[in-house]
Amino acid sequence: MTKFIFVTGGVVSSLGKGITASSLGRLLKDRGLNVTIQKFDPYLNVDPGTMSPYQHGEVFVTDDGAETDLDLGHYERFIDINLNKFSNVTAGKVYSHVLKKERRGDYLGGTVQVIPHITNEIKERLLLAGESTNADVVITEIGGTTGDIESLPFIEAIRQIRSDLGRENVMYVHCTLLPYIKAAGEMKTKPTQHSVKELRGLGIQPDLIVVRTEYEMTQDLKDKIALFCDINKESVIECRDADSLYEIPLQLSQQNMDDIVIKRLQLNAKYETQLDEWKQLLDIVNNLDGKITIGLVGKYVSLQDAYLSVVESLKHAGYPFAKDIDIRWIDSSEVTDENAAEYLADVDGILVPGGFGFRASEGKISAIKYARENNVPFFGICLGMQLATVEFSRNVLGLEGAHSAELDPATPYPIIDLLPEQKDIEDLGGTLRLGLYPCSIKEGTLAQDVYGKAEIEERHRHRYEFNNDYREQLEANGMVISGTSPDGRLVEMVEIPTNDFFIACQFHPEFLSRPNRPHPIFKSFIEASLKYQQNK
């Protein structure tokens, strides 16, 4: 039977529940268990797809096209699994589904209430996460902080699930903060005690407490928390601040967290703890030698979480070369043709990531022009690819006013236009081209060198696509279309072979990169940037 682990948080937000859940998932996977993980978000948006990046950070896309919380990126990268649409559940999605059922008459005229209708819907989605993946263990992170009014239906649902499935199949992990009071010169357990008291008042007794702390805990502190919170002493797990997130699984393993979970849930682990690969990765991360400077030109750079997966993918790509990646955050609204060199002259590579809307798009085009004309390694993603074709059309083909129909509906040369199937769609949420799609790579191209194969699959998130009316013109003037949909209809990758490294893709490769397995485009981009740096 599938076992369920729930990760809650108390005292303050941003304690690292997601990293704790991810690290535990990694430990259990390395013991030979089939693990999946999900996030419950208490906000009323159906999904984060239409939320501002300034509010929410990036939208992470799964293979099956779900637009999800950025924490799912952490989950996938840490555990090295591919998640699905059941891995992110919002209050908005739950309420929306319940209300649709009510309108259909599914409740036979009954009064629809938070208990049992909302809680039953939440529990149903809990079970689907396990059923859809045949998982041995489902780890669920509950967003927010214990006591938040928005989280109460989720807390009630996970309380009920223990009775539904049996105590032996359910486990609760609670993350808290152990603050250091400088004036007193000591760490205080009282916030943890009150947080657990709040959780117990809601009917949940934690089995494990993970304590976030700046300093090493004494055994007396652990004993005190165990006594006041009514758990075993070995079930108080210290999680110290670390220089690298990749240290956290090792910290938890050293305190036998995986053994405690396996014993408590009576899991059949196939192996003893195996973290050799993880230790090798951490050794590389802790011994980087030199840096490569990448100019990331975007419109949301004031909130770096808007590009979280891109940043992580760049870091992954630096590891094989033992290089740290120094990201130069460049606000595209400030870049022009005239001042581009001021921002980009000393970078080793230029990356233009995805985005939506007209604002700051001209600055991205100026950055792309600078990369093309000065032979600086360039990598464009999604909108970055679209604007690369726009820049080429304007400045090489001479099509003055060429643009994307999304950004300039009146453009005389719509190089980028709506996908045909998008023409009559009015709703914004969940209606883009989303998820994993195949791509055919053209022989003899940089793309083929990068991937080393003719067919690939990548994740997408876009509504607009390259306009095939301009295909022949671009190719006749030196831009190569190196990747298309298998039927040849949709342009997925472009490149300029006369440049040392100029490649762009319509898809989002950052969603498939792993710390121990960098995505091939990112790796090739960093390799080209390193060569450019060495030849300066």
Swiss-Prot record:
Residues 293-535 form the Glutamine amidotransferase type-1 domain. The keyword Disulfide bond does not apply. It comes from the Bacteria. This is CTP synthase. Coiled coil: none annotated. Keywords: ATP-binding, Glutamine amidotransferase, Ligase, Magnesium, Metal-binding, Nucleotide-binding, Pyrimidine biosynthesis. Residues 1-267 are annotated as: Amidoligase domain. CTP binds at residues 13, 148-150, 188-193, 224. Pfam families: CTP_synth_N, GATase. Catalyzes the ATP-dependent amination of UTP to CTP with either L-glutamine or ammonia as the source of nitrogen. Regulates intracellular CTP levels through interactions with the four ribonucleotide triphosphates. PANTHER family: CTP SYNTHASE (PTHR11550), CTP SYNTHASE-RELATED (PTHR11550:SF0). One of its GO terms (cellular component) is cytosol. It catalyses: UTP + L-glutamine + ATP + H2O = CTP + L-glutamate + ADP + phosphate + 2 H(+); L-glutamine + H2O = L-glutamate + NH4(+); UTP + NH4(+) + ATP = CTP + ADP + phosphate + 2 H(+). Belongs to the CTP synthase family. CTPSs have evolved a hybrid strategy for distinguishing between UTP and CTP. The overlapping regions of the product feedback inhibitory and substrate sites recognize a common feature in both compounds, the triphosphate moiety. To differentiate isosteric substrate and product pyrimidine rings, an additional pocket far from the expected kinase/ligase catalytic site, specifically recognizes the cytosine and ribose portions of the product inhibitor. GO terms for biological process: 'de novo' CTP biosynthetic process; pyrimidine nucleobase biosynthetic process. Pathway: Pyrimidine metabolism; CTP biosynthesis via de novo pathway; CTP from UDP: step 2/2. ATP binds at residues 14-19, 71, 240-242. Allosterically activated by GTP, when glutamine is the substrate; GTP has no effect on the reaction when ammonia is the substrate. The allosteric effector GTP functions by stabilizing the protein conformation that binds the tetrahedral intermediate(s) formed during glutamine hydrolysis. Inhibited by the product CTP, via allosteric rather than competitive inhibition.
